[in-house]
């Protein structure tokens, strides 16, 4: 197997060429164009967001993103991690890089002692469940600054049981 190097880095420590490589890799899956990817990155990614980078021979082949965001629970503002992105280059998908990035993501969430939320296609719910993610009843949480399709699923990780029973109001973009 080719040697895989995993790195975790905050946005404020990313170099421009790495941001460009991230946007190129994301564009292989979400085909909006590099310029659009860069604009989105510059608009929505904050200094303390966590980027998980997977390299083989100095080439970025996998990427995960945890965005530091806030939610309201019983009128109190709290922090959480929005698991925004997991993408692996098609050429390298058989090397279990997605598994390694998912394990790193879970480890990071536990280390930061926060809960995390993601929105995904129903066809990949089983993948996330392997790493301890739980599907959430759509009536309990609400995303205040983003609409998402009913065909998608919301999942949470490291969430206290009390949060599962009451309404949570999430923010993704602020």
Predicted regions and their residues:
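Terminal substrate-recognition subdomain of acyl/acetyltransferases
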Residues: 1-3, 9-14, 119-174
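A conserved beta-strand-loop-helix scaffold within acyl/acetyltransferase catalytic domains
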Residues: 8-15, 19-86
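Conserved GNAT acetyl-CoA-binding A-motif
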Residues: 107-121
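Short acidic (Asp/Glu) patches
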Residues: 67-68, 101-105, 135-140
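Short coil/turn motifs at secondary-structure junctions
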Residues: 69-71, 91, 123
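Intrinsically disordered, low-complexity linear regions
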Residues: 63, 80, 112, 169-174
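Short loop segments at secondary-structure junctions
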Residues: 56-58, 91-92, 157-162
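Conserved acetyl-CoA-binding loop-helix of GNAT-fold acetyltransferases
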Residues: 88, 94-107
């Amino acid at each position: 197997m080719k040697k895989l190097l995993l790195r975790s880095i905050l946005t404020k420590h990313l170099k421009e060429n790495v941001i460009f490589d991230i946007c190129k890799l994301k564009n292989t899956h979400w085909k909006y164009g590099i310029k659009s990817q860069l604009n989105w990155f510059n608009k929505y990614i904050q200094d303390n967001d966590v980027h998980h980078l997977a390299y083989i021979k100095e080439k970025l082949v996998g990427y995960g993103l945890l965005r530091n965001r806030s939610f309201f629970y019983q009128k109190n503002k709290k922090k959480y991690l929005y698991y925004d992105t997991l993408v692996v280059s098609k050429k390298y998908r058989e090397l279990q890089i997605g598994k390694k990035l998912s394990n790193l993501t879970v480890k990071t969430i536990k280390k930061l002692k926060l809960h995390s939320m993601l929105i995904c296609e129903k066809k990949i719910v089983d993948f996330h469940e392997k790493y301890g993610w739980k599907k959430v009843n759509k009536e309990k949480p609400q995303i205040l600054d983003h609409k998402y399709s009913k065909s998608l699923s919301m999942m949470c990780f490291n969430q206290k049981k009390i949060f599962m029973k009451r309404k949570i109001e999430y923010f993704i973009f602020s």
